């Protein structure tokens, strides 16, 4: 049970991290389009 908690935390953080990276990349992509215009 002791090892289940860290693994659960990691499994919970991975989607959040991927979502954060996607939002950051998307926002930078949108800024690039606005600057190009």
Curated annotation (Swiss-Prot):
Keyword Electron transport tagged: yes
Subcellular location: Plastid, Chloroplast thylakoid membrane
Listed GO CC annotations: chloroplast thylakoid membrane; cytochrome b6f complex
One protein family per Pfam: PetG
Name the UniProt record assigns to this protein: Cytochrome b6-f complex subunit 5
Keyword annotations of the record: Chloroplast, Electron transport, Membrane, Photosynthesis, Plastid, Thylakoid, Transmembrane, Transmembrane helix, Transport
Species per Swiss-Prot/TrEMBL record: Pinus koraiensis
Main location: plastid
UniProt topology in membrane: Single-pass membrane protein
UniProt feature coiled coil, ranges: none
Claim: Mitochondrion is one of the keywords in the record: no
TM segment ranges: 5-25
Entry function: Component of the cytochrome b6-f complex, which mediates electron transfer between photosystem II (PSII) and photosystem I (PSI), cyclic electron flow around PSI, and state transitions. PetG is required for either the stability or assembly of the cytochrome b6-f complex.
GO molecular function: electron transporter, transferring electrons within cytochrome b6/f complex of photosystem II activity
InterPro entries linked: Cyt_6/f_cplx_su5, Cyt_6/f_cplx_su5_sf
Family the entry assigns: Belongs to the PetG family.
Quaternary state and interactors: The 4 large subunits of the cytochrome b6-f complex are cytochrome b6, subunit IV (17 kDa polypeptide, PetD), cytochrome f and the Rieske protein, while the 4 small subunits are PetG, PetL, PetM and PetN. The complex functions as a dimer.
């Amino acid at each position: 049970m002791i090892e289940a908690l860290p693994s659960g935390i990691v499994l919970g953080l991975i989607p959040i991290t991927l979502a954060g990276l996607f939002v950051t990349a998307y926002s930078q992509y949108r800024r690039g389009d606005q600057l190009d215009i």
